[in-house]
């Protein structure tokens, strides 16, 4: 099967909800539609040019407002978890992540911190002194 480059471009832009621009209806339902379509959106709380999830949603949801994600958090319709990287995920997908979250519980994180206590303290010290840092 041969697909023309232009057809492939149109397909990929539509599949990633980028064509036409901001074609997803505005509001909380539109934001949830993007989360459900993608499964997750990488989350980066540090805003160099803007927080990643806000940039992703702004490009796809008409009139996107960052406060909409806060509302979805409060309503427990999205949550943070690790999905290769820290990500925001629709709460409806929680059952798929539950086992992995359980495996990486408090003992898992305590063991990592114990093994890397010197480095962890150095990083925390810099954050206390300088504020948020990029990776």
Label the predicted regions:
Residues 1-133:
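Phosphate-backbone binding and catalysis cores of DNA-processing enzymes
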């Amino acid at each position: 099967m041969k697909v023309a480059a232009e057809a492939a471009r149109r397909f990929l832009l539509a599949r990633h909800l980028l064509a036409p621009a901001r074609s997803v209806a505005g509001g909380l339902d539109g934001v949830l539609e993007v989360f459900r379509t993608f499964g997750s959106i990488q989350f980066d709380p540090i805003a160099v040019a803007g927080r990643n999830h806000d940039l992703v949603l702004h490009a796809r949801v008409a009139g996107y407002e960052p406060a909409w994600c806060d509302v979805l958090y409060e309503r427990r319709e999205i949550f943070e978890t690790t999905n290769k990287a820290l990500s925001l995920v629709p709460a409806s997908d929680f059952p798929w992540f539950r086992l992995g979250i359980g495996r990486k519980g408090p003992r898992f994180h305590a063991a990592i911190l114990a093994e890397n206590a010197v480095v962890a303290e150095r990083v925390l010290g810099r954050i206390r002194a300088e504020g948020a840092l990029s990776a």
